[in-house]
Amino acid sequence: MSGQLERCEREWHELEGEFQELQETHRIYKQKLEELTSLQTLCSTSISKQKRHLKDLKHTLQRYKRHSSHEEAALIQQMTANIKERQNVFFDMEAYLPKKNGLYLNLVLGNVSVTLLSNQAKFAYKDEYEKFKLYLTIILLLGAVACRFVLHYRVTDEVFNFLLVWYYCTLTIRESILISNGSRIKGWWVSHHYVSTFLSGVMLTWPNGLIYQKFRNQFLAFSIFQSCVQFLQYYYQRGCLYRLRALGERNHLDLTVEGFQSWMWRGLTFLLPFLFCGHFWQLYNAVTLFELSTHEECKEWQVFVLALTFLILFLGNFLTTLKVVHAKLHKNRNKTKQP
């Protein structure tokens, strides 16, 4: 037997030994996976049972509170606060357990589990989401500038509007996945992206004509301003969130948003004038489109629908921001009054 063949035989025996070890490791892995699945089912069942009983207990306490004494009312208030805190704990627990997708994710992805089981995977996905927002914001800014000042063609406008539709659709999917994994983004700042997706889709279907050309430059200028503000928000919110996480004041899955939240009060209030300017520009867009919808040459249904959509965006953004600012000012006033 030649020396080269002997080396091949030795290598084969080494690989055979490693293969046996791999098989044993894989057997243990499957066993642990089955144990993990059983534990996940047990935890999910126990959490559902606890939540159901706590809900019943909360209703009972609310009924009893009407006829309670002062001491009993204090005890009921304490128990109610404990129940609320327990519900927050369950929310954190469920972030690490498989769960059924909501209606939107079921429509888009089907019944596929999107739960990321490790903190490392959650943070990696969250960081990738933030980078996606940053890169697309820059691309949309460049696209809006190009369409406004260089490329005066309907086809390039359609490409830009299609990019907006794809961007907002992707954001809604990624945000839904992050919410399933424990991110606390909620309320209007989630709905905002669904409304923006619809608005971009209507803009995409708006045929070229006199009315479209009357609104085109205003919309592109608004898109440029909006992208600049979103870039500023991302840049400064990211730094603010990093500091607050280091102090233990924010969750590691908190996201940058295209608006104003209470945690931004320290260090990011300088963004408020830009945000309010953007909100009122949305109102200006709505008013302009309402006026254009009454133009004798206007035959497109998109004009009136876009006017309503911009009005909804203005009301949602403006009232939500105003609510946050008012609540924070009220809280600060109460603090200064305390001795």
UniProtKB/Swiss-Prot annotation:
Keywords annotated in UniProt: Coiled coil, Membrane, Nucleus, Transmembrane, Transmembrane helix
Inducing or repressing factors: Up-regulated during adipocyte differentiation.
One Gene Ontology cellular component: nuclear inner membrane
Topological category with respect to the lipid bilayer: Multi-pass membrane protein
Which Pfam families does the protein's record reference?
Answer: TMEM120A-B (PF07851)
Q: In which tissues is it expressed?
A: Expressed in inguinal and subcutaneous white adipose tissue and in brown adipose tissue.
Indicate the segments annotated as coiled coil, or none if absent.
1-67
Q: Establish whether keyword Transmembrane is in the entry.
A: yes
Highest taxon of source: Eukaryota
Q: Name one GO biological process term.
A: protein heterooligomerization
Family, similarity comment: Belongs to the TMEM120 family.
* PANTHER family per UniProt: TRANSMEMBRANE PROTEIN 120B, TRANSMEMBRANE PROTEIN INDUCED BY TUMOR NECROSIS FACTOR ALPHA
Q: Report what the protein is called.
A: Transmembrane protein 120B
